[in-house]
């Protein structure tokens, strides 16, 4: 008879892992890094942009290389079958309109990208302070081309070199990671308005290695990154998403609702929405028209699909063509915030989007493109939109313009805000007051907090973090 060997057990970390939380808070409180001053980062980004050859040009769909409109479906696909496709989506909401649109039923083009990409940031301690390795990365859709991205930002097609390009630098730290060095590892969804069930693996991995420092990389503290988040179009969407998942310590462990109550409310929101979603051929999408250079809504609202030719001398592949999605106008993304019994709370909405895996995710108080509602009476516009747009400067606690993921979106930008709320606000159905700490806890699990809320959460957490016993 063979003997059974009992495996050794490992200690289970509590939800608030104080070692990491204290080190993260110290990094957030440190605004002097070992490599460069925060005020020099923008000049360094500009220098990296000037040191390389970057060019993005809009082209007709007919000039796309390796992309074509499939004969039967009309879907816009890559000949390799990899990367992503532009398809159609048919959404029916049986319980009322939600998301970024006033209608109970609609059809639209959508980006379908089944591959799970890696968004990985490498962390290392210098002089007792955690620093994070950021990359000055060119993306064709960035309004200013180069922004600070994660150490690794790559689809499976990229890091397996389906494009025939060079290796993705430092991918070995993330695929697979050393389990003893993982700080963050969670699948998070991307924009449910434009993607169909798209997720990326958000990761932060610590190292003690001597990591090569290429010209397009720099080590920054969390405090430096927090300062840069106050500047327009500097920290890219993927970096913001990953950093929002950091396990900050809850320094005010009280809230209007307990964690169990919050999860019960959220589960009820997911359960009560009856949303039917199915993929359809792009050629069958109603209400949209396709021309030689654009696919657009017949009323000029929402977004467009177009094509670009790209050159990027420091990319794994130095030239290529691809489709991109372009929004029709500047978006608005805002949290209303108030103190309840001295504890800051933000007003979240349980938002329905056709592209979400689980129908509903927690979103900012307001998340929309106002132009899409300009033709509607006030009562049909999103709740709190007018309040946010007309907020006096004295109530605005945070404001910056951030662009969305430049690998799929062309110049898509939103005005991100945190605004002091009127104490008398009573949340309507589908809205709830929660603490930033409760949202942070939920980012440890996928498909709870949407990507727009994660951006604002990253800004709020970095500004508020303090080491235990700190000032």
From Swiss-Prot:
Two binding sites (pockets A and B) for the dTDP-sugar ligands have been identified in each subunit. It seems that pocket A represents the active site and pocket B is a vestige of the gene duplication event. DTDP-4-dehydro-6-deoxy-alpha-D-glucose 1 binds at residues 67, 155-159, 238, 405-408. Pathway: Antibiotic biosynthesis. DTDP-4-dehydro-6-deoxy-alpha-D-glucose 2 binds at residues 193, 288, 351, 367-369, 372-373. One of its GO terms (molecular function) is lyase activity. It comes from Amycolatopsis orientalis. Involved in the biosynthesis of the 2,3,6-trideoxysugar L-epivancosamine, the terminal sugar added to the aglycone scaffold of chloroeremomycin, a member of the glycopeptide antibiotics vancomycin family. This is dTDP-4-dehydro-6-deoxy-alpha-D-glucopyranose 2,3-dehydratase. Signal peptide: none annotated. GO terms for biological process: antibiotic biosynthetic process. Its EC number is 4.2.1.159.
């Amino acid at each position: 008879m063979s003997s059974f060997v009992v495996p050794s057990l490992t200690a289970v970390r509590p939800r608030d892992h104080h070692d990491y939380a204290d080190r993260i808070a110290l990094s957030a409180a440190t605004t002097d890094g070992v490599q460069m001053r925060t005020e020099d980062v923008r000049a360094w980004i500009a220098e990296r942009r000037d040191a390389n050859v970057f060019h993005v040009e809009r082209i007709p769909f007919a000039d796309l290389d390796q992309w074509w409109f499939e004969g039967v479906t009309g879907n816009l696909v890559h000949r390799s079958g990899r990367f992503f496709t532009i398809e159609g989506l048919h959404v029916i909401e049986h319980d009322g309109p939600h998301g970024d649109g006033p209608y109970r039923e609609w059809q639209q083009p959508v980006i379908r990208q089944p591959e799970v990409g890696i968004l990985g940031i490498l962390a290392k301690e210098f002089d007792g302070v955690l620093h994070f390795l950021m990359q000055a990365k060119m993306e064709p859709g960035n309004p200013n081309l180069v922004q600070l991205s994660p150490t690794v930002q790559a689809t499976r097609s990229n890091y397996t070199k389906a494009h025939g390009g060079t290796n993705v630098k430092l991918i070995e730290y993330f695929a697979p990671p050393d389990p003893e060095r993982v700080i963050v590892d969670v699948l998070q969804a991307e924009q449910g308005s434009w993607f169909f069930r798209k997720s990326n693996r958000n990761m932060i991995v610590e190292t003690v290695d001597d990591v090569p420092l290429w010209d397009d990389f720099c080590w920054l503290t969390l405090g430096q990154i927090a300062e840069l988040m106050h500047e327009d179009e500097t920290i890219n969407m993927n970096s913001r998403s990953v950093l929002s998942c950091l396990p900050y310590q809850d320094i005010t462990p009280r809230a209007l609702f307990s964690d169990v109550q919050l999860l019960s409310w959220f589960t009820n929101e997911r359960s009560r929405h009856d949303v039917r979603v199915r993929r359809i051929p792009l050629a069958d999408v109603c209400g949209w028209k396709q021309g030689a250079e654009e696919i657009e809504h017949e009323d000029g609202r929402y977004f467009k699909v177009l094509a670009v030719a790209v050159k990027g001398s420091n990319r794994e592949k130095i030239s290529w063509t691809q489709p991109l999605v372009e929004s029709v106008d500047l978006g608005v993304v805002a949290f209303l915030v108030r103190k309840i019994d001295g504890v800051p709370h933000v007003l979240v909405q349980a938002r329905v989007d056709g592209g979400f895996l689980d129908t509903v995710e927690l979103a900012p108080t307001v998340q929309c493109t106002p132009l899409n509602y300009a033709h509607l009476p006030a009562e049909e516009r999103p709740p709190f939109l007018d309040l946010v747009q007309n907020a006096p400067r004295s109530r605005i606690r945070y404001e910056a313009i951030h662009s969305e993921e430049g690998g799929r979106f062309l110049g898509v930008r939103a005005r991100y805000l945190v605004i002091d709320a009127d104490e008398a606000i009573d949340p309507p159905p589908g809205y709830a007051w929660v603490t930033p700490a409760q949202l942070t806890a939920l980012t440890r699990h996928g498909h709870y907090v949407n990507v727009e809320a994660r951006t604002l959460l990253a800004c709020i957490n970095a500004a508020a973090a303090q080491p235990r016993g700190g000032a």
